[in-house]
Amino acid sequence: MTSRKILVTSALPYANGEIHLGHLLEYIQTDIWVRFQKMMGNECHYVCADDAHGTAIMLKADELDITPEVLIKNMSNKHQIDFQSFSIDFSQYHSTHSQENKDISTNIYNKLNVAGFIKTRVISQAFDPLKQMFLADRFIKGDCPKCGSNEQYGDNCEVCGATYSSIELKNAKSVISGVTPITKDSEHYFFDLPQFEVQLKEWTKAGHLQDAISNKLSEWFKEGLQQWDISRDAPYFGFQIPAVEGKYFYVWLDAPIGYMASFKKLCDEQNIDFNEYFNKDSNTELYHFIGKDIIYFHALFWPAMLIGSNYRTPSAIFAHGFLTINGQKMSKSRGTFIQARTYLNYLNPEYLRYYYAYKLSSKIDDIDLNLIDFKQRINSDLVGKVVNIASRSAGFIVKKFNKTLSSYTIESKFYQEFFDCGDIIAKHYEARNYNQAMRVIIKLANKANQYIDKHKPWQLIKKPNQQTQVHDVTSLAINLFRVLMTYLKPVLPIMAKQVEKFLNIDELHWQDLKYPLIKHQINTFKPLMLRIEDDQIERIIEASK
């Protein structure tokens, strides 16, 4: 079987805030898929970066009395520590504020400009006369021009749902300074998205997107595509538009290009051919994992920019839903706006990896982290079922049989059943239906435990003439545990390493499962995973308020 060449990305976390459990849903989803691809023998690179530009970064740095460069460096360090703690294994983690990103962004812009895809026109915007800066919609608040509700942002009303321009807002105030904005004209640069309507319609209907996303895009096509404002006025933290004074690339122009920039850095470091992955006629695979809220940028602007600058388009975009906790939006007052670091202070990161896997499918439905179900699921599935197989069997092998598995198994058909399930589990992983993969695995874990219950080695060991059967039963149980942990390795990489040490093997490999471990010496079993206690959940909630 020919090895596939795959490049995978996750959306870039913004560099003005810390990672929380909502962010982690996507990175865990992506990491599981990448680890699975590598287990299948595919060449798979996983790149990401901090999204480090924009007005919010500039203002946050100003508030902290540091430079934007210091802010984004500090935040990048925090992000990477959190990701490493959750076993998110990037091939490269970079920043959009990099030379690679500046070079590629400039190159793409110049290609689009020469081809006639960049237009200019004068627009009217809200302007803060005190801070001497134009105001993005989220930096203006006032009364909704439709229903009159106060404290609404400059683009839409959260009360009546109306959309409008910021200059229509009544009694508007600058969120930054508190003064009343004035209206001021400025020349802006636009990417002429409507020119790509035909290519985009073809691309969005060619199997690159989930059906729900493709249907949503059809609605947007009916409404008509609009030119996209890709410029922002100084002061702004970002890359200056070539040969244009006081104008910068909008953060959403260089953010997706950050995927390419991060990969370019990896290519330079590891002697990988960048063009093999991004040339227009590339035979490699490119996948973007994103949240459903940024589909417009990734499924319209991004492929259009790539087409216009003569690069390849993504093989597919995989969107997921939002995270809710206990059925509601994450909330600081309820203690459910949980930072990654807060979680790590109290719980094993692999609990969350498993629970997300148990919930995630290829659909864009929202995922609920119900903390009661979370505790019960981990205690039942991982501790009570999977780990229990090894903990019930290893003691017999170690104490009674010199740590050595038996020379043959009396239930070879049973082992074959576990092995044969590998194909369907692999299909579920490939299709990102992790929830289905987990259900197959736990069903097998139940069967393994039932097998041990049926033979009762703790009773057989008391009978001198049943020692061989005890040896065979517990040896088979250990082999079944090995199969299950191989299937779970993309989800539980830390525990998989501990199991490799316990089993005294180099690595758990999918292709090695055809044959059980025979006459093989294992090591003493050590507890692999502890139960979640109620007070651990309670302390996380308290610490998050």
Swiss-Prot record:
Cofactor binding remark: Binds 1 zinc ion per subunit.
Main location: cytoplasm
A GO molecular function held by the record: metal ion binding
Reactions this protein catalyses: tRNA(Met) + L-methionine + ATP = L-methionyl-tRNA(Met) + AMP + diphosphate
Localization: Cytoplasm
GO biological process terms held by the UniProt record: methionyl-tRNA aminoacylation
The protein's Enzyme Commission number: 6.1.1.10
UniProt-annotated binding residues for Zn(2+): C144, C147, C157, C160
Keywords: Aminoacyl-tRNA synthetase, ATP-binding, Cytoplasm, Ligase, Metal-binding, Nucleotide-binding, Protein biosynthesis, Zinc
Motif 'KMSKS' region mapped to chain: 329-333
UniProt cross-references to InterPro entries, sorted A to Z: aa-tRNA-synth_I_CS (IPR001412), Anticodon_Met (IPR041872), Met-tRNA_ligase_1 (IPR023458), Met-tRNA_synth (IPR014758), Methionyl/Leucyl_tRNA_Synth (IPR015413), MetRS_core (IPR033911), MetRS_Zn (IPR029038), Rossmann-like_a/b/a_fold (IPR014729)
Annotated binding of ATP, by residue: K332
Domain of life: Bacteria
Entries under Gene3D superfamilies matching the protein: HUPs, Isoleucyl-tRNA Synthetase, Domain 1, Methionyl-tRNA synthetase, Zn-domain
CDD domains named in the record: Anticodon_Ia_Met (cd07957), MetRS_core (cd00814)
SUPFAM superfamilies: Anticodon-binding domain of a subclass of class I aminoacyl-tRNA synthetases, Methionyl-tRNA synthetase (MetRS), Zn-domain, Nucleotidylyl transferase
Cofactor needs: Zn(2+)
Pfam families: Anticodon_3, tRNA-synt_1g
Motif ('HIGH' region): 13-23
HAMAP family referenced in this protein's UniProt entry, alphabetically: Met_tRNA_synth_type1
PANTHER family noted in UniProt: METHIONINE--TRNA LIGASE, METHIONINE--TRNA LIGASE, CYTOPLASMIC
Task of the protein: Is required not only for elongation of protein synthesis but also for the initiation of all mRNA translation through initiator tRNA(fMet) aminoacylation.
Family statement: Belongs to the class-I aminoacyl-tRNA synthetase family. MetG type 1 subfamily.
Protein name per its UniProtKB record: Methionine--tRNA ligase
